[in-house]
Amino acid sequence: MRRVLAAAEKPLHWVGSSKRDFLRFPAAVKEDMGNALGIGQFGGTAPSAKPWKGLGPGVLEVVESHDGNAYRAVYTVRFEKAVYVLHAFQKESPSGIRTAKRDVDLVADRLKTAERDYEEHFGKQKR
């Protein structure tokens, strides 16, 4: 008989205002995104998670629509012992299909913050 060992749950860390912003989302959006983040905590990738362009592997985005609005959460699973939520925001329509530069820049800055936090709390990331 084969035994399947469950992956250990990685703690979820929120960078900057990401948790406060996430908690402002509609309940249905929080539930769906929360499920995706939970899958990431156990080492998986939710079907709704897509790569975030420009920051390399392990940075993912979940997009949910609700009442004509688009909500996004960007997180990273590139660390061995933790998952970091980098940004949660409602997509602004004036920028069209592209994500606003301020959001792209904020994600990049918060990834650097997450890297520093991870090193401080867990030690150097193995490459």
Which residues does each predicted region cover?
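Hydrophobic/aromatic beta-strand elements that line small-molecule binding cavities or substrate pockets
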Residues: 73-75
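Active-site beta-strand-loop-beta-strand hairpin of nuclease catalytic cores
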Residues: 77-85
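Basic, Lys/Arg-enriched alpha-helical interface segments
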Residues: 1-70, 79-80, 90-127
